[in-house]
Amino acid sequence: MDNKEQFTLTVFSENRSGLLSRIVGLITRRKINIETLTVSTSSMEGIHRFTIVLSISEKVVQKVVAQIDKQVDVLKAFYYRNKEIVFQEIALYKVPVEAMYNGTKVEKIIRKHNARILRIESEYVVVEKTGHERETEALLEEFKKIGIYEFVRSGRIAIVKEMERLNKYLASVENELQDN
């Protein structure tokens, strides 16, 4: 049996409706769980970027990426191990404002985790933390001890450490688009 590990897929595409559904369907048909999914514009005008995190074997990720590459409107798909990328997630926490009145405990927690206060309202405080999943989870566990109203974490955003492969491909796509 192949060992599972975490891979980050980066898919470059044109902005077409229905593509997200096709990509998700392609993955879920294989009974693969999507850990996180983020879609945004890329550095190239008119090109969108999907960042998908999967925990599977390398053999399976190669097949998934090959299938995604065959989709109409997909320009190119890549996969990376965690050591090949720089990645972060953002988390928001809504905690009771009363927690702020109990001395400096909450302030110390926020500083310890390199988080920041985004908003203070009459009933709650919104705290933001950017980091890896284990870091945002650690802050969540601290806030659970003092009370938390709400928690949400984004999907992964990632940039590839090695530039050559991606830059060459994007340059070839840009040249191809200009020729058409």
Predicted ranges, named:
Residues M1-R49, V53-N180:
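Long, contiguous binding/interaction regions
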